[in-house]
């Protein structure tokens, strides 16, 4: 392609989808998106391993729930449900007509005389755009472990973010490297089918109560009576995450954390940076002590 557009956006994950929603509502139509994957979803397009789920409650994580009239099925939605939701967003707001998939932007060149960007892609495109916006995120490229001898390993190997479902793990001896958020989700699922499972870790994980559950019909009926229920919930979650006092926590577990934050923020004078860091570390230590006590008991 060698044509022009007013706005060119790189990325079709949640950032790109939400940007299109905002631009469309603001009256912008001459917009084009470039996405290196084969569909929308961003990190949820690339990551499709067994057990994948969001570790933020779905009622706060999913954008535009009111506009979509959608209620997540679980408190912590699976990655597959999130991917399907991204597709529904794209279909509802006409995103697919605006996006070039399997297209990677390799470089952009500002042309001063024409006051526009020349955008070069891996498919030979040289498009012009008045504005270029990066919405490509950080979680789409696998970080491969540098392990001596991997190049001569004769068995099957792959990264979780590029899960190979053509490899049948049933009754196999499997090793998984790492115990971060991904492994915590993968290990319980593949342990159900493999013959032997070896988990290699550098640092043990600290895992708190997940409290996974289905969304109840009573909750859905209540939310239907509350305009902007998801926006309000998201605002409360943001306050909790930033360490600010929230008027109402989203659940009992977070309520305990909020009370702890509130206690630590009660002071009669402005704190120095060092004092604030000390109080934040103290709060974090108390939360981690709760987790450690749960593990030992």
Show the residue positions of the predicted features.
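Active-site signature of alpha/beta-hydrolase-fold catalytic machinery across serine-
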Residues: 18, 22, 189
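Conserved beta-strand scaffold positions in the cores of enzyme catalytic domains, especially
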Residues: 99-100, 155-158
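Glycine-rich nucleotide phosphate-binding loop and flanking beta-alpha elements
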Residues: 16, 139-140, 183
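N-terminal FAD-binding dinucleotide-binding subdomain shared by FAD-dependent oxidases/monooxygenases
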Residues: 1-7, 12, 21-150, 166, ...
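Rossmann-like NAD(P)H-binding beta-loop-alpha module
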Residues: 173-194
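Glycine-rich Rossmann-fold phosphate-binding loop(s) that bind the pyrophosphate
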Residues: 11-17, 179-180
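Active-site glycine-rich loop that binds ribose-phosphate moieties when present
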Residues: 160-162
């Amino acid at each position: 392609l060698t044509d022009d557009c007013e706005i060119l956006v790189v990325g079709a994950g949640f950032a790109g989808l939400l940007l299109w929603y905002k631009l469309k509502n603001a009256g912008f139509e001459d917009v084009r998106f470039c996405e290196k994957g084969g569909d929308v979803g961003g990190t949820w397009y690339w990551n499709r391993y067994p057990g994948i789920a969001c570790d933020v409650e779905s009622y706060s994580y999913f954008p535009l729930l009111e506009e979509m009239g959608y209620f997540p099925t679980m408190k912590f939605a699976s990655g597959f449900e999130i991917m399907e939701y991204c597709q529904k967003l794209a279909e509802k707001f006409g995103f697919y007509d605006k996006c070039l998939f399997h297209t990677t932007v390799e470089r952009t060149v500002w042309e001063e005389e024409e006051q526009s960007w020349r955008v070069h892609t891996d498919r030979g495109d040289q498009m012009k755009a008045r504005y270029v916006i990066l919405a490509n995120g950080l979680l789409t490229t696998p970080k491969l472990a540098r392990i001596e001898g991997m190049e001569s390993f004769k068995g099957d190997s792959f990264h979780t973010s590029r899960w190979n479902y053509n490899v049948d793990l049933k009754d196999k001896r499997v090793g998984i490297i790492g115990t971060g958020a991904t492994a915590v989700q993968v290990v319980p699922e593949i342990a159900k089918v493999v013959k032997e499972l070896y988990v290699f870790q550098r640092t043990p994980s600290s895992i708190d109560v997940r409290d996974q559950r289905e969304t109840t019909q009573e909750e859905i009926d209540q939310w239907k009576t509350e305009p902007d229920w998801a926006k309000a919930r998201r605002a409360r979650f943001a306050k909790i995450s930033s360490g600010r006092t929230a008027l109402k926590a989203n659940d009992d577990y977070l309520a305990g954390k909020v009370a702890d934050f509130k206690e630590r923020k009660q002071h009669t004078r402005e704190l120095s940076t060092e004092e604030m860091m000390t109080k934040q570390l103290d709060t974090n230590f108390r939360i981690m002590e709760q987790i450690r006590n749960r593990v030992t008991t």
